[in-house]
Amino acid sequence: MPKLKTKSSVKKRFSVTATGKIKSTQSAKRHGMTKRSKRSIRVQRGTAIMNPSDSRIVKLFMPYSR
């Protein structure tokens, strides 16, 4: 059986934590930030843990992650 390929787009956007959760950066930060409050801008600086139902799909595209 041939090796499975990792999706390059998923590899760039997501990472796997030591416990197996999927971590990504917050979305919706590219433009239009003047309308938002300082608190919402500050919160979006960090990372987000994906919902387990969505992370199952992402894990299919990353066959050799932990």
Curated annotation (Swiss-Prot):
Annotated PANTHER family: 54S RIBOSOMAL PROTEIN BL35M, LARGE RIBOSOMAL SUBUNIT PROTEIN BL35M
UniProt-recorded Gene Ontology molecular function terms: structural constituent of ribosome
Record-linked Gene3D superfamilies: 4.10.410.60
Protein name: Large ribosomal subunit protein bL35
Signal peptide: none
Protein family: Belongs to the bacterial ribosomal protein bL35 family.
Stretches of the chain forming a coiled coil according to its record: none
NCBIfam families xref list: rpmI_bact
Keyword Metal-binding: no
PROSITE patterns in UniProt: RIBOSOMAL_L35
Gene encoding the protein: rpmI
Gene Ontology BP, a term: translation
Alphabetical UniProt keywords: Ribonucleoprotein, Ribosomal protein
Phosphoprotein in keyword set: no
UniProt biased composition (Basic residues): 28-40
GO cellular component assignments: cytosolic large ribosomal subunit
Region annotation Disordered: where it falls in the sequence: 21-40
InterPro entries, per database record: Ribosomal_bL35, Ribosomal_bL35-like, Ribosomal_bL35_CS, Ribosomal_bL35_sf
